[in-house]
């Protein structure tokens, strides 16, 4: 009925909808305790952490951890998230809700904890056909402030071959077309890392957070393969592969 519709309008998950904090708190939601506009501005200007993979693991863990650190005043900047498989997560979930999400946690005692998570302040598609998103990703990767690039893209996200050990068609095409407009996921990540190399060989930690053995090695092997092929095919500066392999500059911890 009209009452229910009215309450849904009032409880809209967006920057505008969250202005009525009392309404949300009465309904049992914990809200961000930090100045989100200020955090958004600082993060976009000087991003320090970008995460690839905008799924549930990211929303429940990385985003929630950063929210707690922002709430406690330990951090002054939030997260940027990029999605490379399912662009609709960004276009139909993140953007309409101003990058806010709701985390519902079932506690051991049976209580349900509801939290509005506001630590993600920008979301982008990892899509070379979306020129503005990919240009923005390159801009983020060129920033001095960037320290950490993290991933939850599933184990298969790092694979360059199919079940038979044959190169995936997109990967094969990317090896010969170079870093301008790659189609494969790791090709796009390698192209972004190349943008960081071109901006002055700036240091960065490339951190796989997927639950697989030696996850950092898998990420390194995939990116290094691109660096090798692109150098072989004279599609990048000669120093890019050395940059990927220089542990003072780029690390792949596991």
What do the PLM-derived regions correspond to, one by one?
Residues 9-254:
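Non-transmembrane, aqueous-exposed alpha-helical and coiled segments at domain scale
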Residues 1-10:
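Short, Lys/Arg-enriched N-terminal segments with co-localized hydrophobic residues
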């Amino acid at each position: 009925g009209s009452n229910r519709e009215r309450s849904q309008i009032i409880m809209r998950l967006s920057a505008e909808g969250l202005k009525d904090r009392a309404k949300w708190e009465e309904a049992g939601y914990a809200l961000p305790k930090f100045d989100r506009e200020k955090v958004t501005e600082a993060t976009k200007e000087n991003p320090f952490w970008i995460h690839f993979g905008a799924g549930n693991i990211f929303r429940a863990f990385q985003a929630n951890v950063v929210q707690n650190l922002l709430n406690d005043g330990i951090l002054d900047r939030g997260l940027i998230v990029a999605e490379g498989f399912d662009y609709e997560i960004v276009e139909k979930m993140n953007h309409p809700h101003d990058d806010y999400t709701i985390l519902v946690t079932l506690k051991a005692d049976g209580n349900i904890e509801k939290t509005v998570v506001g630590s993600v302040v920008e979301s982008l598609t990892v899509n070379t056909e979306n020129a503005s998103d990919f240009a923005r990703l390159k801009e983020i990767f060129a920033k001095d402030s960037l320290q950490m690039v993290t991933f939850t893209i599933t184990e298969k996200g790092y694979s360059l071959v199919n079940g038979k050990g044959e190169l995936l068609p997109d990967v094969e095409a990317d090896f010969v077309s170079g870093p301008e407009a790659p189609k494969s996921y790791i090709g796009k990540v390698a192209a972004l890392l190349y943008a960081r190399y071109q901006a002055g060989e700036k240091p960065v930690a490339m951190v796989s957070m997927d639950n697989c053995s030696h996850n950092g090695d898998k990420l390194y092997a995939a990116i290094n393969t691109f660096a090798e092929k692109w150098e072989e095919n004279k599609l990048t500066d000669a120093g890019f592969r050395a940059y990927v392999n220089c542990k003072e500059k780029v690390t792949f911890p596991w």
